[in-house]
Structures are given as C-alpha cells and as structure tokens.
C-alpha cells in the first residue's frame, strides 16, 4: 500500500469508538438470543428450536450476502456500507419487536442477517484491510480488545432491559439505540473513501488474484475455525456438566475463555509486527492443544480452556490479516467477502449439528469431534504455510 495515498489512520479514540460500536452491532444481532430466547419462547409459545433457528437463518442470509458485500465495499468503500448496517439492524429489531407471529419473527432475522453481513467483523475488517493493508493490523487488534467484552456488557444490559421493558420493548429500545448511534458514529469513525486502486479494481471486475490451492485451504481453515468456535460456545457448559462439574463450576471454567482471549490480543498488540502466518499457526496450535487437554486430561481442564481461549482470541486477527499475505489490498475486499461465505454458513449449521450429535452420540463424542476439528484446522494451517512458502520461493518474496 502506498502510504501517501492512504487516509489518516484512526487514532486511539476512534479505534475505541469502533470497538464500542461493534459491541452494539454484535449485541443487537449475533448475541441477542443469549438473553432473549427464553423470554420470547415463554411469551409467545413458539418452540425454542424455532426461536433459536432465527439466528441460524440470519447467519445463512449473511453467508449468502457476504461476497456481494465484499464487492460493494471494494466499489464504494466500507464507510457507507457499514454505516447503513445500523439502519438495517434497526429495521430488523423493530420488526422483531412488532412480530405478531412466527413468520414475521423469522423474517426479522432475514433482515438482521443482512445487518450482520454489512456490519460485523467481516465487513469492518475487510474495509480496514482494503484501505490500510498490513497497517490495519493494530487497528483490528485494538477494536477486538474493546469488542471482546461484548457479552460482558451486552448480556447484563439486555437482561436489565427485559426486566424493565419485556422482550418486545427491549427489541424496540435497542432498535432506537442502534439507529441513533451506529449510522452517524460509524460515519465519524471510518475514512470517507477507499483508495483509488481498490476502486479501479472493483470496477474492472478482476478475477481471483491468488492460487486456487491457497484460496481453498485458507477458506477451509477459516470455516472450520468458525464452526469450532460456534460449537464450543453452544456445548461447552453441557460437556463440562456431563463430566461431573456442577453448573456453577462449569460457568466458572467457561468464564476463563474470555479473559484469555483478551490477554492474548494485548500481547499481540504489544509485539506489534507479528507475522500473520506465525499468528495463524500459534492460534490453531493453541486451540488444538487446549481442546486435547480438555479431552484427555480432565484435571487440567482449566488450563486447557485458557489455552483454547488464547488461540481463539487470535482467530479474528488471523482471519483479517492472513489474506493480506497473498492478496493485494486492492483485491482484499472482494476475496475476503468470498472467503466469509463458507465460514458464516458453517456457523449457521453448527447449532443444528451440535444438537443432533449430542442427542444421538452424547457429550463425550462431541468433545472428541471438537478436538478432531481443532487438529484438522492445525493441519490445514501447516499445509497453508507450505503452500505460501512455495509461492514466495517461486516469486522471490520475503518470508512471512
């Protein structure tokens, strides 16, 4: 990236603002049902499967839209797209608040799926990567440091709102909040224009700029890592309780994951010029080691979860920066949008698959499968490292 053509990088205040806005973005969509699922089911009589299925529908819609969103960011810049995300989310939440039946509730999740596609990590980090190239890394890490506290902030807030307003009032109030906050503040925090090469590249409709083998291995790695994270967030408490832990003990153990995620991001930010490929190997390796410890060494389950949390904490950074090793910033938005589709689709299917596996094979089989997925992700990362090394040797590039 030619730094002379770049807009000024956001300072600490704008990075912190982006982190806070991401808390609202995630809290009004992906994490919404963590608090609202039970109140919605109890009030309406709709089954929990259908209530929770709304989130899967939203993720499915996001997966279908992500390549188009990537092309749109390449063409018009992330500022307009991500600011519009606030308007779309407000519409979806308002529809949910007013939903007279299950069909309208599920339609609201279709709209929220469009909001997720245009404003969560994939869209934001795609915009930053396309604009700043590798210089986006400290911005991305800084945003994840703040947004990593999303559930810590949002779930108690949503619980209080449900207590005071009911679930419909909570959706309505949150719709107003994101409408007045996200649209104007994203426009304030993000640069106004994409750089010219990215704009020209999008207009010319350039094809896939990297080797198919690297593209597909990287895409598979991101999809498996996303599915793994989603599965663990769903089944961790169930697996721990099946192994003899009380609910209170299981919650305490699961709570170790969040601080470990944030701590590893602080360390990554302090180390500054960490090579993305090294970070990817570290992330997938620590995730695999952590889950193997959870699987085979029950007495060290706490350390296993800390190790898993540290590896998973680097995942968002890896997903945003690793493609820049092999993709020019001008092509980054389009490629990143394409890569996001399988990962989002895996996240949409994960809750259904987890429920089926636990009900048919049991929690022990579930933890075996999760450890196997983590090992597969690490193997793909090693394969990717070899492919990138071969590519760099062929083109005489420096190692990453």
Where does each model-flagged region fall?
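Hydrophobic core of transmembrane alpha-helices in multi-pass small-molecule transporters
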Residues: 23, 103-119, 144, 223, ...
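Intracellular juxtamembrane helix-capping segments at the cytosolic ends
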Residues: 40, 118-132, 314-327
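Helix-loop-helix hairpin linking two adjacent transmembrane segments in secondary transporters
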Residues: 142-193
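C-terminal transmembrane helical hairpin of 12-TM major facilitator-type secondary transporters
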Residues: 257, 261, 274-322
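A late C-terminal transmembrane helix in Major Facilitator Superfamily
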Residues: 329-363
